[in-house]
C-alpha cells in the first residue's frame, strides 16, 4: 500500500528506532507536545528550545506527528488560556513535522482531563449536529488556524524543516525554521506585554501577526 501513511501512538521510547524497526511512517511527538504547553504555562521558553533541539534529531530520520491536543489530554485552551493557545498553534504550524488538530481545538474548545472513571468525557464532547450550532466563541481560533495552514501550504518544505534558535529567554523566544534547500521562516514568540507572535518570511515580510486576549 504505497499511498498509505501509517502513524503510531508512542509516549516514551527511542522514537527513531521504533519508526525504523516497525516500518511506520511516523509517530506521536509527545515530547514536543509537553514542551509547548509547559513552556507557556511556566513562562520558560528554555524548555521549548531544548525540546526543539531534540525534535531536530528526530527529523533527521522521520517527520514526527505533532500536536497540541488529543483524546487523552487536557485541551490546550484550558491548559494555557486562549492567548497561550494561539502561540501554541503558531509553534505547531511553523516547525518541522506533520501537524494535526484534535477536533474542537480549532474552535478553542475547553476541557480538563481527570484521573477518574469518565475523566476523559470533558475532552471528548459530541459535536453539534451542524456547524451553525457551534457557539461562535471559537471563530477567532478557526480563522487563526486557517491562516497558519495557508502559510504551511505555501511552504511545504516545513514538513522537514530544522529549527534554529535566534533569541532565547524565559518570556521571549525567536527561531528560524530552515528548509534543506535554504528556505527560511522567522518566528518570534513573546509573553510580554501580552502573549503574541509574529511570523515573517526570509525577506522580512510579515506573514502573520498573532495575538488574542483571554
Describe each model-derived feature in a short phrase:
Residues 1-64, 91, 110-147, 151, ...:
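Active-site-proximal helices and loops of the catalytic beta/alpha 8
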Residues 3-8, 98-105, 156-162:
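Acidic/polar loop patches that form or flank catalytic/metal-binding clefts of enzymes
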Residues 7-9, 66-69, 102-105, 187-190:
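Short beta-strand segments
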Residues 58-82:
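Active-site clefts of carbohydrate-active enzymes
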Residues 63-64, 99, 171, 183-185:
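A generic secondary-structure signal marking the coil-to-beta-strand transition
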Residues 83-89:
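Short, acidic/polar
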Residues 93-97:
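C-terminal substrate/ligand-recognition segments
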Residues 157-183:
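Surface beta-strand/loop "capping" patches
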Amino acid at each position: 500500500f504505497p499511498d498509505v501513511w501509517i502513524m503510531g501512538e508512542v509516549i516514551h521510547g527511542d522514537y527513531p528506532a521504533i519508526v525504523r524497526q516497525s516500518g511506520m511512517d511516523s509517530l506521536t511527538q509527545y515530547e514536543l507536545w509537553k514542551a509547548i504547553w509547559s513552556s507557556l504555562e511556566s513562562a520558560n521558553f528554555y524548555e521549548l528550545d531544548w525540546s526543539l533541539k531534540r525534535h531536530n534529531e528526530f527529523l533527521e530520520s522521520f517527520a514526527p506527528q505533532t500536536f497540541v491536543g488529543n483524546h487523552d489530554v487536557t485541551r490546550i485552551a484550558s491548559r494555557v488560556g486562549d492567548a497561550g493557545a494561539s502561540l501554541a498553534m503558531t509553534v505547531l504550524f511553523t516547525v518541522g513535522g506533520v501537524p494535526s488538530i484534535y477536533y474542537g481545538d480549532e474552535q478553542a474548545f475547553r476541557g480538563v482531563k481527570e484521573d477518574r472513571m469518565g475523566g476523559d468525557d470533558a475532552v471528548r464532547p459530541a459535536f453539534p449536529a451542524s456547524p451553525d450550532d457551534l457557539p461562535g466563541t471559537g471563530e477567532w481560533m478557526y480563522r487563526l488556524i486557517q491562516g497558519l495552514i495557508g502559510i504551511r501550504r505555501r511552504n511545504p518544505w516545513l514538513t522537514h524543516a530544522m529549527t534554529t534558535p535566534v533569541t532565547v529567554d524565559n518570556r521571549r523566544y525567536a527561531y528560524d525554521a530552515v528548509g534543506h534547500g535554504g528556505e527560511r521562516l522567522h518566528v518570534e514568540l513573546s509573553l510580554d506585554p501580552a502573549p503574541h507572535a509574529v511570523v515573517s518570511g526570509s525577506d522580512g515580510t510579515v506573514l502573520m501577526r498573532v495575538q488574542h486576549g483571554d
